[in-house]
Curated annotation (Swiss-Prot):
Its main location: nucleus. GO terms for biological process: mRNA processing; RNA splicing. Residues 19-94 form the RRM domain. One of its GO terms (cellular component) is nucleus. It is found in: Nucleus. This is Splicing factor 3B subunit 6-like protein. Pfam families: RRM_1 (PF00076). It comes from Arabidopsis thaliana (Mouse-ear cress). GO terms for molecular function: RNA binding. May be necessary for the splicing of pre-mRNA. Residues 16-29 are annotated as: Interaction with pre-mRNA branch site.
Length: 124
């Protein structure tokens, strides 16, 4: 089913579908231009961010202008072979990407730093 027929049939998309894709298992030496060549075939791209430090190398975020283009890319590029590596293309999900943190611990750390540097957030 093409992107145009998806739009015309007023197909409802699953809730996890969004314009931002998270791509894993990329070759470490892939360039932005190569990413645009691969992902641009499925629609207009707003932004591509490739991981460059030790922890994020081999990953990227691809942001499409249109949600249907993103769905089409996921459908066609999951498992796509690039330099003998099979891409893992997922929809970005904020809850899964962000680390859970202890709010009380964070507030305690902020309080300690405020005391250390003499900073107050209270109105005088």
């Amino acid at each position: 089913m093409t992107t145009i027929s998806l739009r015309k049939s007023n197909t409802r998309l699953p809730p996890e579908v969004n314009r931002v894709l998270y791509v894993r298992n990329l070759p470490f030496n892939i360039t932005s231009e190569e990413m645009y060549d691969i992902f641009g075939k499925y629609g207009a791209i707003r932004q591509i961010r490739i991981g460059c430090d030790k922890a994020t190398k081999g990953t990227a975020f691809v942001v499409y202008e249109d949600i249907y283009d993103a769905k089409n890319a996921v459908d066609h590029l999951s498992g796509f072979n690039v330099a003998n590596r099979y891409l893992i293309v997922l929809y970005y999900q904020h809850a899964k990407m962000s680390k859970k943190f202890d709010q009380k611990k964070s507030e305690d750390e902020i309080t300690k730093l405020q005391e250390k540097y003499g900073v107050s957030t209270k109105d005088k």
